[in-house]
Regions:
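ABC ATPase NBD coupling module
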Residues: 20-23, 74-91, 121-122
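Conserved ABC transporter NBD signature motif
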Residues: 65-73
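Conserved ABC ATPase signature
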Residues: 144-154
Length: 238
């Protein structure tokens, strides 16, 4: 396994709510995600999967513990610094694609690039075209996203997650809104991109087939990681 750690957390604690409704959502969670690897987090609804992804994605702050990207602690950064780190270093994929329906596929992929503001308009258009070509949509650059199938829309979301060449991709039920065939295609595409480009992918899923096809599986219960073991992808290469 590649020993280069892209994303890690140590002893994460998170409480949600107030007083009698206060919930201990994460309890001492520690995790390391290597470059070029796919890690799946599984467990029942309410076990803390989404809370963990929000903290690792710098969308929420832990009450205790530390998050690091490329071995650099980030939990102490200001809101503006966290936003910059998030935009540059982390790509997000969700169960629902959240595309702008009236934007073309190319324009949707360009949105994170515009937010980061490091490329010219021509450079953004070319990068978006290259990414869409990589997910098999190079012939639909100018098609409004509302005219795409569900599987195609999720492929646009995958391309958008790669827009700023992030080190880390976080995916919350990325295939949960797709049928079985499109789920398998979307995951295989994402898995290949991660392995080929040396990204680190952490996904939360209820799909046992996708979890088993990952490199590592982390089982969560009641806010804790109770077990971690190699998935089928890791076993097949060892």
């Amino acid at each position: 396994m590649n020993s280069e750690i892209c994303l890690s957390c140590e002893a994460i604690e998170r409480y949600i709510g107030e007083e009698e409704e206060r919930v201990h959502a994460l309890r001492g969670v520690s995790l390391e995600i290597e470059a070029g690897s796919v890690h799946a987090v599984v467990g029942p609804s309410g076990c803390g999967k989404s809370s963990l992804l929000y903290i690792l994605g710098l969308l929420d702050l832990p009450d205790a513990g530390r998050v690091s990207i490329d071995s650099e602690p980030v939990s102490h950064l200001s809101d503006d610094e966290l936003a910059q780190k998030r935009n540059k270093s982390i790509g997000f994929i969700f169960q629902f694609h959240f595309l702008m329906e009236d934007f073309t596929t190319q324009e949707n992929v360009m949105i994170p690039m515009r937010k980061l503001g490091e490329l010219s308009d021509n450079e953004m258009r070319q990068r978006a075209a290259d990414l869409l070509e990589g997910v098999g949509l190079g012939d639909k650059l100018r098609r409004p996203s509302r005219h795409l199938s569900g599987g195609e829309q999720q492929r646009v979301a995958i391309a958008r997650a790669l827009a700023n060449d992030p080190r880390v991709i976080l995916a919350d039920e990325p295939t949960g809104n797709l049928d079985t065939a499109n789920s398998e295609r979307a995951f295989e595409l994402l898995q290949n991109l991660v392995h080929e480009r040396g990204k680190a992918l952490l996904l939360a899923t209820h799909n046992p087939a996708i979890a088993e096809a990952s490199d590592w599986i982390h089982e969560m219960k009641d806010g804790r990681i109770i077990a971690s073991h190699p998935g089928g992808a890791q076993s097949s290469t060892s």
